Amino acid sequence: MQRRGQRDLWRHNKSCARNRCPRPPRERGGAGFPWVRAQLSVRQFTLRVRVPGPVHLRGRSPTPALDPLAPLNPLIRGPRTPGLRRWIQSLALLLPNCSSSRIPTVPRPHSGLWVQSDFPLGFLSRTEPRLTRSCRGAFRSPRPLPKSGQADGTSEESLHLDIQKLKEKRDMLDKEISQFVSEGYSVDELEDHITQLHEYNDIKDVGQMLMGKLAVIRGVTTKELYPEFGLDMND
């Protein structure tokens, strides 16, 4: 029964194939060959050729495992500068009037070709060539130089004013010295008093430093330590 069922299934498939693509009746002289050629020309055959790969790559996918593409952040475009674009356009209109000798040849990056640039070298630099040449010279003061006669007059006037101020200061010091002498003070006594004041200030600075360190160690303020040593806040 099983063989009979297989035979019926095979006959059914064969009849279906004949119905889809009927075969013309056989004729003498090999008349069926054109039909075979027509079928071969219509049908497309795909040949799959397997090339044995290395042993360590068998059973793996032929394409390498790549990481998934990360989503790209949208590019942030800066503010537009229409003023710069207009300036470049106006400069491009003026450039054709310039001579071709001023337009140098600039090498393109990553290539051995020399391409003639659209702008002169002065356009590439921030300062004009005239300014760079002037900078190479000696330093010039921004103040205008006075004339010879005017300079002599002003210098003499300024010298007279300085001399007058020094004389007034000397007279003032002489008056103070004469006043101290009249009160009974002497120059040696005044110098001794000044040296004692300097020594007092030095000792006071050292004492304040020691009081501050002691206050930090005890965790109190220096104001609380003054009565302990018999000192006043005015000292």
From Swiss-Prot:
One of its GO terms (biological process) is cellular response to ionizing radiation. Changing L173P: Does not affect interaction with SFR1/MEI5. The keyword Endoplasmic reticulum does not apply. Residues 156-183 form a coiled coil. It is found in: Nucleus. Gene3D superfamilies: 1.20.5.170. Pfam families: Swi5 (PF07061). Component of the SWI5-SFR1 complex. Interacts with RAD51. This is DNA repair protein SWI5 homolog. The gene is SWI5.
